[in-house]
């Protein structure tokens, strides 16, 4: 397994829909193993293939549900269903804050549906589905968003959208080709401290 560099916000691979996986699952095993390893070393709860520069509809996750139980898995060609997504300003108390390995070290309140279900193939090529509420639902929406070419900062509203744009510009994350490598570069989220 190899830890791969994580692509930062300005790269086009993050802003275009990924390609549906059509190759045999056996040809994806190294990629999926690398995705799990990269996510783990980055202390992430999810990672989409395009976040490591690969335009394929695959994401991995290791995320807690509302009771704190960890759920780990992989979805290939996922389909997302959700409850209604709120159109109001998200809470400013930290409960709606979301971060992203491709927007390193930053977090912004993000409105998400409270329930989500994902259906797709697992890393063995078997069809499966999982549903969750709260943080797990947020994780599923975030990762499928990546595969659809949507970074979570694209979904922000009001002052959070304006602040995210300023932050992205101030960090120079509008250009393609920028990356950070977990375990090599300083952890932008402060997990090393």
UniProtKB/Swiss-Prot annotation:
Its EC number is 3.5.1.88. Removes the formyl group from the N-terminal Met of newly synthesized proteins. Requires at least a dipeptide for an efficient rate of reaction. N-terminal L-methionine is a prerequisite for activity but the enzyme has broad specificity at other positions. Belongs to the polypeptide deformylase family. It is an enzyme of class 3 (hydrolase). The active site is at 143. InterPro entries: Peptide_deformylase (IPR023635), Peptide_deformylase_sf (IPR036821). It comes from Corynebacterium efficiens (strain DSM 44549 / YS-314 / AJ 12310 / JCM 11189 / NBRC 100395). One of its GO terms (biological process) is co-translational protein modification. It catalyses: N-terminal N-formyl-L-methionyl-[peptide] + H2O = N-terminal L-methionyl-[peptide] + formate. Pfam families: Pep_deformylase. Fe cation binds at residues 100, 142, 146. Disulfide bonds: none annotated. Signal peptide: none annotated. Keywords: Hydrolase, Iron, Metal-binding, Protein biosynthesis. This is Peptide deformylase 2. Binds 1 Fe(2+) ion. PANTHER family: PEPTIDE DEFORMYLASE, PEPTIDE DEFORMYLASE, MITOCHONDRIAL. GO terms for molecular function: metal ion binding; peptide deformylase activity. Its cofactor is Fe(2+).
